[in-house]
Design a protein with these regions (language model features):
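Cap/lid segment of the alpha/beta-hydrolase catalytic domain
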Residues: 122, 130-188
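Catalytic-loop region of hydrolases
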Residues: 30-124, 137, 148
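N-terminal secretory signal peptides that target proteins for export/translocation
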Residues: 1-8
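Bacterial N-terminal signal peptides
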Residues: 10-24
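Signal peptide processing junction and immediate N-terminal pro/mature segment
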Residues: 20-34
Length: 188
C-alpha cells in the first residue's frame, strides 16, 4: 500500500460506500422520521453495497442485521472493551479487503476491514483502532476501550464505525519480515 493512502482510504471507503448505497445519509435521515416505511429501503440499500466498485478494494460480504442482541465481543481481552451483550438497532455490515497482495515472504497481505452503517445514521464516523500489532478485525461497534465502561458503543449512538487489521492477519510479528506490511501497520 502506498504510504499516504491508508489514513485517507478508510473514510473515503465509508463515504463511497455510503454514496454507492443510494445516498445512505439522506435515506437514513428519512428512515429516522418514518422507520416503519423505510426499513425495507435501508435493507435494499445495504444489499446494493455488494455492487460498489472501488479501486484496490474487494467487498467480501454485505449483511443486513436486524434489531436485536449482538454476541459478546470475542476480542474484548485485546481491545479492553466490555464483553457485555448489546441490543443493537438495524444496521448494515460490510466486510472487505483493501489492496490484497502476496508479500515478499510469500504470505497474503491486505488490510481487512469491517464497516457498520446504522439505519439511523447520525452523519458521524468513528475509526476504531486495533492496538498493539493489530492482526485481527474487531467487531466494528465502537465499544469504549476501558474496562468497566458502561457508555453505549458508538454504533448504538448512530455512528458509522469501521475497524481494520493493520494490513496483516495474526497476532504475531512475522509480518515484520515484509517491508510493505510494516509500512501498512505504521500508517494504519
Amino acid at each position: 500500500m502506498k504510504l499516504h493512502r491508508l489514513p485517507a482510504l478508510l473514510p473515503l471507503l465509508a463515504s463511497s460506500l455510503s454514496a454507492g448505497s443510494l445516498l445512505w445519509a439522506a435515506n437514513a435521515q428519512a428512515a429516522a422520521a418514518q422507520p416503519a416505511d423505510n426499513a425495507a429501503d435501508a435493507q435494499t440499500r445495504c444489499s446494493d453495497l455488494k455492487e460498489v466498485e472501488l479501486p484496490d478494494v474487494v467487498i467480501q460480504r454485505v449483511k443486513w442485521v436486524q434489531r436485536g442482541g449482538l454476541a459478546q465481543d470475542p476480542n474484548s481481552a485485546f481491545t479492553g472493551a466490555s464483553g457485555q451483550t448489546l441490543q443493537a438497532e438495524e444496521h448494515c455490515v460490510v466486510r472487505g479487503e483493501i489492496e490484497p497482495r502476496t508479500g515478499a515472504d510469500g504470505r497474503h497481505y491486505g488490510t481487512q476491514f469491517e464497516l457498520r452503517l446504522p439505519a439511523r445514521w447520525n452523519h458521524k464516523f468513528l475509526f476504531q483502532g486495533g492496538g498493539g500489532t493489530d492482526g485481527f478485525v474487531a467487531d466494528a461497534l465502537g465499544r469504549i476501550p476501558t474496562r468497566g465502561s458502561s457508555a453505549p458503543p458508538a454504533l448504538l449512538r448512530g455512528y458509522a464505525v469501521v475497524s481494520m487489521d493493520g494490513g496483516h492477519q495474526g497476532r504475531d510479528t512475522i509480518f515484520g519480515k515484509d517491508q510493505q506490511a510494516r509500512l501498512d501497520l505504521a500508517y494504519a
